[in-house]
């Protein structure tokens, strides 16, 4: 122990006496370890972290896919359930202590605290079964949790609020428990606050603000409630395994229950059964561990995190190579000192241990600095990844596993890249080292040093090429033709109370909104729609074309659709390329009409004019419902990375009266619009207050969720790609800088070692230009070898990322050419100063020194 302390004190003295070396080494390590730890922090928080609940390993989800919100016939792997089906499955699973159900897609509701809120707030609420909090083993931070007695239609309406919302929206009001809130205009009693750190069973960027009992959904959603007869599939289910029980046999028992239910008891329309029944034997249930909750962000960000992990791992390798080169150069510079100590009787093992201690100390100090870089870096990454989100339920603070990872990484770095320099330094022969201590004719950089510089150049090219590909892909995404205009367009997300308007009242409300907004001085036109392009929403439906029979119940036959007002297409800038748009003649008393996009026209009406043709939703019974009057230009509504889906549009002013209960319910629900679109003129920066006031004057109960420009709405779709591209670009620049530092150090060291040789050359007639060429040739030879190795590696890395690239090849010559030029320019900048110093050598002084 005493010897170890002596070695540590000696290492600290050595580092203190070489501040430039120490600072460079620590900065290099801090960047490499910090960036890698930051990515590991986010990976652990998003991909690996368990829910903050009791014994999460005992939780299992029934089903393992993520559906949108309702229905669920598209997948054989069944994951979405109606309330009666959930009850049937729960009863057939005795291995579970209890099974809870919860809403797959929590919605936005108008929520106001009695006597304290002047205006309602647009907050997200999730319906849960009465045993939800009990299954997760959670108590309330204040008050009590929702229980089974609350989950009754006859019970008094209650709600729980999240700890985050209680703090941020209600100022941690200690008297909030027991107060009255109005949800969609209905009074409820707030009975409790959820524990800190619990954001629901799904890790998402918009977690619930409130939780409501499942069976009270009918109170708030009225005629649109999912709990009414003809139940749709809209719930997820999670069960808690009994101690000692196993889930292995459970899927085989639950699958027949599901199939019997779908065949005999599911309240699907009779005319739909002939198409559905043949697919029932293919339906099955799978159970998956649910300790991490329902995967949402895991699915969304998994690929990006893997790319960033590879990028940071590469950056760490470059940083380690730089550190090893610094240690090798430092060991070579101390050859004479090492020789003296060996001549005086110092043991080689002691010298190795001392230099290894110095490397380990550097690594530990660099790791501590890296934790600071990791904390800041993780916060920066969260800000970039969730730029459009108001809240992110992910902690940027490194957890204990992350701290252990950083510590282990630091030690590993010190051992791997400290052993070789220490061993090489200890091999010095005292007589040889002392004889050449003052000579300037040493051979120069060693082979390991050259290999490290070549490795840095190769890996830097890989990072630069990857960053270039990701940046070019992002540019292609943002500059593509979306099929609509974003300039001077504004979107407003609204939430009209579902049970407050009859269809007649809705028509009057919509006319008042359009007329009131158009009267504003900076508004040229206004329209309404169920949802606007690239807003994260999608309505899907099967369609049947007149004369072609029933559609099959597969996703491939599904299309998207929207319900829009007459001015919609001109307001958003989506052109009608054939036929006409909606007009005054398309009223509630005229024949139902539709406009289809080019993709739907190509798919269902190839080689014929779709205008004048008829189609309907769901099945052939309704195939003559809508007459196509126009074809709209293809536009991207769902995924900007994919081609436009087939899509049709229905006029907001028309309704169809269906004999089928489910179809009629959908018809009513889709008349509640969620989006207003505006075409503005002039400066729109100060328009939001005017818009809010105008809408409040029309209907004070109309909840406004967001007001943003169309360009902002579109840009929010690329937050993840932007984060990856910006971080990869930053890491690529850092890698190039580290490679330049390594090349500069090696070139300067080589020049210092060859001072006498340079003096001899100049004495024999070599001019300064020849000396500069000599030095640059040696430096560029190393870089050229690095490029030869790095180009195939970069091509391979591009192929690994191909799925993340948009309209760019994984070996794009422009990107690769720019990366090579950038690395070459950096190498030239790193080599020119040592070359200039070599050319400025005084031959007499150099020879006299020798």
Specify the residue positions occupied by each region the protein language model found:
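Short, strongly hydrophobic transmembrane alpha-helices
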Residues: 19-46, 50, 319-320, 363-367, ...
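Small-residue-rich transmembrane alpha-helices
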Residues: 39-42, 286, 324, 360-430, ...
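Membrane-proximal extracellular/periplasmic loop immediately following the first transmembrane helix
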Residues: 51-106, 236, 268, 477, ...
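Alpha-helical transmembrane segments of integral membrane proteins
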Residues: 1-22, 293-297, 326-353, 357, ...
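Interfacial "coupling" helices/loops that link adjacent transmembrane helices in transporter permeases
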Residues: 319-363, 741-780, 787, 834-837, ...
């Amino acid at each position: 122990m005493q010897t170890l302390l002596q070695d540590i004190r000696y290492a600290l003295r050595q580092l203190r006496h070489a501040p430039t070396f120490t600072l460079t080494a620590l900065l290099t390590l801090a960047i490499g370890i910090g960036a890698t730890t930051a990515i590991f922090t986010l990976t652990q928080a998003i991909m690996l972290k368990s829910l903050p609940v009791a014994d999460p390993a005992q939780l299992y989800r029934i089903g393992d896919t993520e559906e949108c919100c309702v229905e669920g016939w598209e997948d054989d792997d069944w994951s979405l359930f109606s309330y009666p089906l959930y009850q049937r499955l729960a009863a057939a699973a005795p291995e579970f202590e209890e099974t809870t159900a919860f809403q797959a897609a929590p919605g936005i509701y108008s929520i106001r605290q009695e006597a304290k809120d002047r205006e309602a707030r647009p907050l997200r609420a999730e319906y849960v079964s009465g045993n939800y909090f009990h299954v997760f083993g959670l108590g309330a931070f204040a008050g009590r949790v929702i229980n089974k007695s609350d989950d009754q239609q006859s019970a008094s309406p209650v709600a729980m609020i999240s700890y985050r919302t209680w703090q941020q929206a209600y100022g941690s009001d200690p008297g909030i428990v027991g107060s009255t809130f109005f949800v969609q205009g209905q009074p409820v009693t707030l009975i409790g606050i959820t524990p800190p750190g619990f954001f629901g069973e799904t890790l998402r960027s918009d977690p619930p603000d409130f939780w409501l009992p499942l069976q009270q959904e009918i109170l708030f959603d009225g005629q649109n409630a999912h709990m009414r007869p003809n139940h749709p599939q809209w719930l997820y289910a999670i069960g808690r395994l009994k101690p000692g029980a196993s889930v292995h046999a459970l899927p085989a028992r639950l699958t027949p229950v599901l199939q019997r239910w779908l065949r005999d008891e599911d309240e699907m329309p009779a005319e739909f059964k002939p198409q559905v029944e043949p697919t029932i034997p293919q339906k099955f249930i799978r159970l998956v561990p649910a300790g991490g909750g329902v995967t949402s962000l895991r699915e969304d960000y998994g690929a990006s995190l893997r790319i960033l992990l590879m990028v940071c791992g590469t950056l760490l390798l470059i940083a380690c190579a730089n550190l090893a080169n610094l240690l090798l150069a430092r060991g070579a510079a101390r050859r004479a000192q090492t020789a003296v100590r060996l001549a005086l009787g110092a043991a080689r093992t002691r010298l190795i241990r001392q230099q290894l201690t110095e490397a380990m100390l550097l690594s530990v100090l660099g790791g501590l600095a890296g934790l600071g870089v990791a904390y800041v870096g993780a916060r920066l990454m969260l800000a970039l990844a969730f730029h459009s989100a108001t809240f992110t339920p992910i902690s940027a603070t490194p957890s204990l596993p992350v701290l252990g990872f950083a510590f282990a990484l630091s030690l590993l770095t010190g051992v791997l890249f400290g052993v070789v320099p220490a061993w090489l330094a200890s091999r010095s022969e005292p007589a040889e080292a002392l004889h050449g201590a003052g000579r300037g004719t040493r051979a120069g950089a060693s082979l390991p040093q050259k290999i490290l510089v070549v490795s840095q150049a190769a890996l830097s090219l890989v990072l630069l090429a990857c960053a270039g590909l990701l940046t070019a892909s992002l540019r292609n995404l943002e500059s593509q033709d979306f099929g609509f205009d974003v300039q001077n367009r504004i979107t407003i997300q609204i939430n009209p109370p579902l049970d407050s308007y009859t269809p007649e009242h809705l028509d009057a409300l919509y006319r008042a909104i359009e007329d009131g907004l158009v009267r504003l001085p900076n508004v040229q036109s206004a329209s309404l729609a169920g949802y606007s392009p690239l807003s994260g929403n999608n309505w899907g439906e099967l369609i049947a074309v007149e004369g072609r029979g029933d559609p099959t119940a597969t996703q491939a036959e599904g299309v998207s659709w929207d319900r829009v007002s007459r001015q919609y297409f001109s307001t958003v800038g989506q052109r009608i390329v054939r036929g006409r748009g909606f007009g005054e003649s398309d009223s509630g008393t005229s024949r139902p009409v539709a406009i289809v996009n080019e993709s739907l026209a190509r798919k269902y009406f190839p080689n014929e004019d779709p205008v004048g043709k008829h189609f309907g939703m769901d099945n052939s019974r309704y195939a003559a419902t809508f007459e196509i009057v126009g074809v709209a230009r293809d536009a991207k509504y769902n995924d900007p990375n994919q081609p436009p889906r087939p899509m049709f549009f229905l006029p907001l002013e028309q309704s169809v009266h269906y004999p089928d209960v489910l179809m009629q319910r959908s018809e009513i629900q889709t008349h509640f619009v969620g989006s207003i679109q505006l075409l503005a003129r002039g400066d729109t920066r100060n328009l939001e207050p005017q818009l809010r006031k105008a809408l409040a004057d029309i209907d004070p109960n109309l909840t406004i969720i967001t007001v943003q420009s169309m360009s902002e709405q579109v840009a929010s779709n690329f937050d993840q790609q932007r984060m990856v591209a910006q971080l990869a670009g930053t890491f690529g620049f850092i890698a190039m800088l580290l490679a330049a530092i390594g090349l500069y150090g090696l070139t300067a060291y080589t020049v210092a070692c060859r001072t006498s040789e340079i003096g001899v050359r100049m004495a024999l007639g070599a001019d300064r230009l020849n000396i500069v060429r000599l030095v640059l040739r040696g430096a560029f030879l190393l870089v050229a070898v690095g490029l030869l190795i790095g180009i195939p590696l970069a091509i391979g890395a591009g192929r690994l990322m191909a799925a993340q690239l948009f309209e760019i090849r994984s070996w794009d010559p422009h990107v690769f050419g720019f990366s090579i030029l950038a690395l070459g320019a950096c190498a030239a900048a790193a080599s020119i100063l040592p070359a200039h110093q070599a050319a400025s050598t005084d031959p007499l002084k150099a020879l006299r020194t020798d």
